């Protein structure tokens, strides 16, 4: 009922401004406040698996920004950003969990939406095996220049398409990225169907084979699929799980898969590691494992 009243589509992410965000908050009781962010969740997962990782993002020198930075320090993530007092506050995401464990997100990007190429640490990217980006940030102007700078410097790039509506808004740009710039693309089934205008998953498989790069797709209870050149790899989802909160399922899946990829595991083993990580996170509240 709350979703309908506030024009929210279940299981998606809606961008809101600060006024709308505060209005939504005024009608709710907040159960818990935790650090998040799609790629940040993946990076923390990678750190917990023993990888050396760093994160480039943007927060303000305010209460939430300081908590956010400390959460990364606690997880042994090197954070490249000199935060300072800003008029724009740290970004915030309101996550609504319905009884079926689905999550619906309302995001006020705050200063995160103002990340620009000056915020990109060139040395950090040059030293990295791989740079992982999120499609969510394509929703604002300045981050595109930050993305472009990262693409030019990176040794290898991966990106999550993030959200079905995100794909709809930036279809041409995303398709160009997937075809011409990214080495690895992560998407769920709905996102990839929307991206290529497909009516069936068979069309997705054909697209993936023609792509010639690594395309990794999560299919909820149907498991996951990775397509690389002419090969298709599949992994079943884990059964009999106690679903609590689907927030971060894709983020932690990406963490597990990338852990396998950068540690020279096979594509099949990487899918299995991604499935294992996603299965753990959906059985708890929030998008980070303890």
Where are these regions (language model features)?
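Alpha-helix C-terminal capping segments
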Residues: 43-52, 96-98, 260-263
């Amino acid at each position: 009922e709350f979703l309908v009243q506030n024009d929210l589509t279940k299981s998606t992410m809606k961008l809101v401004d600060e006024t709308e965000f505060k209005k939504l908050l005024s009608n709710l009781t907040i159960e818990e406040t935790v650090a998040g962010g799609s790629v940040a969740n993946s990076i923390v997962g990678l750190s917990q698996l023993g990888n050396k990782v760093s994160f480039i993002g943007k927060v303000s020198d305010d209460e939430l920004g300081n908590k956010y930075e400390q959460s990364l320090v606690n997880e042994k993530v090197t954070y490249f950003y000199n935060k300072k007092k800003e008029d724009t506050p740290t970004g915030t995401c309101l996550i609504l969990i319905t009884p079926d464990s689905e999550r619906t997100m309302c995001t006020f990007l705050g200063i995160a939406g103002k990340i620009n190429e000056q915020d990109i640490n060139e040395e950090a990217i040059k030293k990295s095996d791989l740079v992982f980006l999120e499609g969510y940030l394509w929703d604002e102007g300045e981050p595109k220049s930050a993305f472009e700078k990262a693409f030019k410097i990176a040794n290898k790039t991966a990106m999550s398409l993030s959200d079905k509506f995100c794909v709809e808004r930036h279809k041409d740009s995303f398709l160009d990225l997937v075809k011409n710039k990214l080495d690895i693309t992560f998407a769920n089934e709905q996102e990839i169907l929307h991206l290529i205008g497909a009516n069936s998953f068979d069309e997705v498989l054909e697209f993936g084979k023609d792509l010639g790069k690594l395309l990794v797709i999560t299919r909820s209870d149907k498991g996951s699929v990775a397509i690389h050149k002419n090969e298709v790899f599949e992994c079943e989802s884990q059964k009999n799980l106690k679903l609590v909160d689907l927030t971060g399922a894709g983020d932690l899946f990406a963490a597990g898969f990338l852990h396998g990829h950068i540690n020279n595991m096979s594509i099949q083993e990487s899918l299995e590691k991604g499935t294992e990580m996603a299965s753990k996170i959906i059985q708890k509240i929030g998008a980070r494992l303890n």
